[in-house]
Amino acid sequence: MYIIRKAVEYFKPKINRAYMNEALKKLTEKEKKIFLEMSDYDKFHSLEVYKKIKKTELKNNEKYSKLALLHDCGKENVSIITRVLHKLGFKTQLRNHAQRSFEKLEKVDEEVAILAKNHHNRDYSQEMDAFQECDDES
């Protein structure tokens, strides 16, 4: 069921424009540009993570709100086939997306860039554990 849901979200992401505009108010102009360059699926996913963050102890943490929106900016526009292969454990270009996210963000907000680089690292911090739970559920 998970794979079917993800496929539907990939091909037909239902982005709530009003909610997206609300979330974008958290970002600087440079951060907005990075967010808006993401694929529709990654924007949808990031907004879902952002929505979940707002229901946790991270809800007032500006850096983690930004991380929710920008953590996957390094994925760029990869195909669904690459995404499925990655989920199945094959080495794909997605394995380096956290580093590419860091590189895109480091001159914009170094702290968010460092968080993006580490958003898959377990035991990084309690805050990151809470973030990862939201990311994994989205």
Q: What is the meaning of each model-derived region?
A:
Residues 1-33:
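Non-catalytic interface/linker regions that flank or bridge core catalytic/transmembrane domains
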Residues 32-45, 51-138:
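Divalent metal-dependent catalytic cores for phosphoryl transfer on phosphate-bearing substrates
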